[in-house]
Amino acid sequence: MSNLNDKIYDVFIAGGGINGVGVARDAAGRGYSVCLCEMNDFASGTSSSSTKLIHGGLRYLEHYKFRLVQESLKEREILLNMAPHIIWPMRFILPHTKGMRPRWFLRLGLAIYDHLGYRKILPGTSNVNFANQKTNSPLKDTFKSGFEYSDCWVDDSRLVILNAVDAASKGASLRNYTKVTNATSSNGLW
C-alpha cells in the first residue's frame, strides 16, 4: 500500500496473531508509533488453532524450569483477572496407576505447582479417590486414585481480536489482508 511508505513508524510488525497484536498493543501503549500488517485476517493462523489453554506449564516442572512455571502461573492469573469474559477456570483430572511415576512424586510436583502459583481465584490441587465412582464412568477400572488441578480455557481468537482493538485504540495502525513481501533498509531505517 502506497500510504505505508508515507510514514515512518517506530515499530513495524508482520503478523496479526497473538504475538503480533500483543507486541503492537504493548508498543502503542508505551507511546511508539506502530504499524502491523497481516496477510490474512487477524487470528486466522496458529493463534486460532491453539490448545486454547492458559496453563502454568505443569510439564516443565519435570525439567526443573521453576522460573518459567512461576512466570506462566503469574501471567495466567493476570489474564484471568483481565478477561474473565473469555477465559474460564477449568479443572483437570490426572488419573494414577502403578505403572506411572510414584504417587508421592506426582503429588510433590503438584504441591510445587500450587506453591509457585499466585492463585487468588483458582482452587489448588487435590487428591481424588475413584473407588466410589459410578458405573458408566469414562475412566478405566484400573484407575483407583488421581489428582485434580486447575488451569484455564481461553477463546483464543477473541483474545487476539481484543488485543488488536486495544492496540488500535492506542494509536496502532492495523492492516489485515496486507501481505508484507519485502523490507529494505535505507538510511538506517527499515
Label each PLM-derived region with a short phrase.
Residues 4-19:
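Beta1/beta-strand and adjacent pyrophosphate-binding region of the FAD-binding site
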Residues 22, 55-56, 158, 162:
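Short amphipathic alpha-helical face segments that pack within enzyme cores
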Residues 24, 28, 166-168:
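Gly/Ala-rich phosphate-binding loop of Rossmann-like dinucleotide-binding domains
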Residues 28-48:
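Glycine-rich FAD pyrophosphate-binding loop
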Residues 52-136:
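Dinucleotide-binding Rossmann-like beta1-alpha1 core, especially the glycine-rich loop
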Residues 113-165:
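Short linear elements at protein peripheries
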Residues 147-190:
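Helical element adjacent to the flavin cofactor pocket in flavoenzyme catalytic cores
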